Structures are given as structure tokens and as C-alpha cells.
């Protein structure tokens, strides 16, 4: 981890599919051993039942399947049971297929053909006091149990057990947002891979002023990732700010000398996601540096980043961080817009939001508490005038990925503190 990122970093080695599977399964085994007992203790549940159907995976179940299983088949049921007394958490699967040795098979269809009855018998035999099911009106991450599967599951239980059902929202968010030491050994390298590819697009190799369009750059990223065998979780966004033009230009806009290029880019690798926004300036003929006003705008965004990362505290809400960071930034005479979010198994990950681009006030989605051992996308904008452009106000969008250990926020692979320069010829 570093404060300042390397300009145009070299592309790190990319694992083969087989080697990726080995790493993914090692991470998953470690997470199941390490995170699940913690989750069940924190949320005071002794059983957690997750159900996924083929082509309709619960977002949590999708992160618990080994690299060969990949998807739910027919109906995949996972059960975690904490017997208490210091005994290890049971990991069971009530399904026809094994799951990489990570869950103990607990259904013999020859003995009990009805999968729901088999599950009900398993639950009754353990007599849990709280049974978490993934049903939530507040979070999609805790709402993966479909209506039909919920109804059939509940119908199979005794009235007494039905009364013990609680929402799996809390456990789902905790499982998804928590990063392990093993993951954090790898995450900086994953972001370095993203930074390397992003840097390729912000270079003369790709950008030919007067010829290349912003869409050309976006599709370069898609093609490059396909070539590397790496996924993206969203289509890259590329646009330009131009002197004399108020709004961001994109689509078939031809990039010209003097343009400020903005790119929003993210990858998925080893099941973890990145999310980065960087800025590049296309030099005019005879220029050797960007205008001072553009450099000052990026510096203003860096100061807002400092305001956000400096506001992190364990146990406060995303709304609290938003309010504190905005006050700090505005007290410095800055004009911020803050819309940061958790990052991990999902690009817009589980956990509290820290503002939204269209809402800088407290939001129900920002009420959750901030926990240590979590990764964040520090996403925001600084609005600043550019004297060289006649005082035109420009939105300097930045986004950098960082880890919060409970004490400090550290960037996984540094952050952009100087504009990337692209020659005009």
C-alpha cells in the first residue's frame, strides 16, 4: 500500500484460470474458517440458512461456492450452525452436489427425496434459537431468498421453528464487507493490474488527438481486458472536459489537444473488484505541462479525499463521515461532492454509503456502521474554476481504492496526485 501511485505501472503477471481457481478456493476456505464464526457471534445467530436456485443465485451464496462449482445447481442450500460451547461452526449443504469439500453433504435423496423435508429435519435436530434467512427490505445483499423458496422453506418447518426466523441482512453484509489478511495480501496487486490497464488507455498508444474518440478509448479497455482474460463489472466511462464547453463530452466526441480526459474504470479479478477514476491532460503543441488551474483542481480533489479518509472512525455511520468530510472540505474553501462506497465482492459493495452524487444529505443507505477490515472506494468530485479557461468551473472527478484497518485509511496502490500527460503528436 502507498500514498502516491506509480505513473504508468507495468502490467503485473496474470494467473492462468487453473491457478486463479487455486487462489480463489484458498481464500474461500480461509474466509469460511475465519469470517463465518465471527459473523454468527456478532449477530447472535446460531443458524444461517441460504438458498439459491440455478440461474438465480443469492448474492451471498455466489461468493461461497468454490471455483469449480461456480453456480448453484437445481437448488443449492447452505447451512451454518454454531453449536456453542467453543465447538466449531458446522458447514452443511443440503443439495445433490458436493461443493469442493468446503461443506459437509447433509442430504441423501434416496432416504428422503424431498429436499425441504430433509432441510427441516436437519434444522429440527439442531433446534436453533435464531434462524437467519436472507430476507431484507433494506439491502439487496441480504434479500437473496426468493418469495417461492421462502414460502416453501417456512412451510416445511414446525410452527415453533418458524417463530425463530430472523433476517439475514446483518450476517450477509458482514460476510461480504469483511476482508481477510489473505485477501489484503492480494488486493493491492489486483488494483495495480487495473491501474496498469487504465494507464495504457491514457497514453499516446491509444489516444491520437484529432482522431480518437472517447468511445474508442472505452472500447479499448473492453478489448484489452478480454485479451488479458480479465473481467470488468461495468462498461468503462470516458469523457472530456474542454475549454468553453460547460458539460462533459463523451460518446463520439473526438479528443483534441487541450482536453482533460476523465475515465471511470474497474475490473474483477480473483472475485474482487476495483473502481478507479483518473484524469489525463492532452498537451497542446508546444506545451510541456498542464495548465496550473487544472493541476490545482486535482489538488483540491486530493484535499477532499483527505477530508473523507480523515473522518473514518469505527462504529460511526456513513452519513457521519459524509457530514464531517463535507464540513472539513468546505471550511477549507473547497466545493465538494462526496459519493464514496464499500468495495469487495461487489463494485458497489455491502456496507454503508458515504453520500451520493445526487444527494449530499443524510440517506437511509448511509445509516450502517463503519467496521474495520473493510475496503472502500473513495469517490468524489471537487468543483473548481480554471483561470486559464476563463474561470470556467470544472468537475474534477476522482476515485481511489483504500483499506480501513480500524485506525487509518490506506490506499491500496496509491492515489493520483498529478495529471497524466498525453502528447499531442
Residue ranges of each PLM-predicted region?
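Active-site neighborhoods and metal-handling regions in enzymes and metal-associated proteins
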Residues: 2-425
Amino acid at each position: 500500500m502507498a500514498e502516491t501511485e506509480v505513473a504508468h505501472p507495468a502490467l503485473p503477471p496474470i494467473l492462468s484460470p487453473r491457478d486463479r481457481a487455486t487462489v480463489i478456493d484458498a481464500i474461500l476456505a480461509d474466509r469460511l474458517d475465519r469470517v463465518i464464526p465471527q459473523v454468527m457471534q456478532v449477530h447472535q445467530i446460531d443458524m444461517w440458512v441460504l438458498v439459491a436456485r440455478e440461474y438465480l443465485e443469492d448474492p451471498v451464496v455466489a461468493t461461497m461456492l468454490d471455483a469449480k462449482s461456480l453456480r448453484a445447481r437445481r437448488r443449492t442450500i447452505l447451512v451454518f450452525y454454531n453449536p456453542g460451547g467453543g465447538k466449531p461452526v458446522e458447514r452443511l449443504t443440503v443439495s445433490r452436489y458436493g461443493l469442493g469439500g468446503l461443506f459437509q453433504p447433509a442430504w441423501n435423496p434416496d432416504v428422503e427425496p424431498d429436499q425441504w423435508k430433509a432441510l427441516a429435519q436437519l434444522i429440527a435436530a439442531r433446534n436453533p434459537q435464531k434462524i437467519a434467512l436472507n430476507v431484507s427490505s433494506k439491502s439487496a445483499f441480504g434479500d437473496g431468498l426468493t418469495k417461492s423458496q421462502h414460502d416453501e422453506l417456512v412451510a416445511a418447518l414446525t410452527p415453533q421453528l418458524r417463530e425463530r426466523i430472523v433476517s439475514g441482512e446483518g450476517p450477509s453484509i458482514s460476510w461480504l464487507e469483511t476482508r481477510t489478511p489473505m485477501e489484503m495480501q492480494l488486493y493491492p496487486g489486483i488494483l495495480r493490474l487495473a491501474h496498469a490497464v487504465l494507464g495504457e488507455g491514457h497514453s499516446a498508444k491509444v489516444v491520437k488527438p484529432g482522431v480518437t474518440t472517447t468511445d474508442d478509448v472505452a472500447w479499448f479497455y473492453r478489448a484489452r481486458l478480454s485479451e488479458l482474460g480479465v473481467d470488468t463489472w461495468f462498461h468503462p466511462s470516458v469523457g472530456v472536459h474542454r475549454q468553453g464547453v460547460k458539460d462533459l463530452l463523451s460518446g463520439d466526441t473526438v479528443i483534441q489537444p487541450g482536453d482533460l480526459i476523465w475515465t471511470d474504470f474497474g475490473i474483477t479479478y480473483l472475485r474482487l473488484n476495483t473502481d478507479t477514476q483518473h484524469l489525463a491532460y492532452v498537451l497542446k503543441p508546444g506545451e510541456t505541462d498542464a495548465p496550473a488551474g487544472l493541476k490545482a483542481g486535482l489538488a483540491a480533489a486530493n484535499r477532499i479525499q483527505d477530508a473523507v479518509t480523515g473522518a473514518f472512525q469505527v462504529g460511526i455511520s456513513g452519513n457521519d463521515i459524509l457530514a464531517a468530510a463535507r464540513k472539513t472540505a468546505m471550511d477549507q474553501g473547497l466545493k465538494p461532492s462526496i459519493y464514496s462506497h464499500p468495495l469487495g465482492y461487489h463494485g458497489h459493495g455491502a456496507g454503508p454509503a458515504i453520500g451520493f452524487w445526487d444527494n449530499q444529505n443524510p440517506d437511509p443507505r448511509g445509516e450502517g456502521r463503519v467496521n474495520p477490515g473493510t475496503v472502500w472506494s473513495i469517490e468524489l468530485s471537487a468543483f473548481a474554476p480554471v483561470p486559464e479557461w476563463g474561470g470556467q468551473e470544472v468537475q474534477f472527478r476522482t476515485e481511489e481504492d483504500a483499506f480501513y484497518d480500524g485506525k487509518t485509511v490506506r490506499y491500496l496502490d496509491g492515489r493520483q496526485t498529478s495529471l497524466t500527460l498525453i502528447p499531442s503528436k
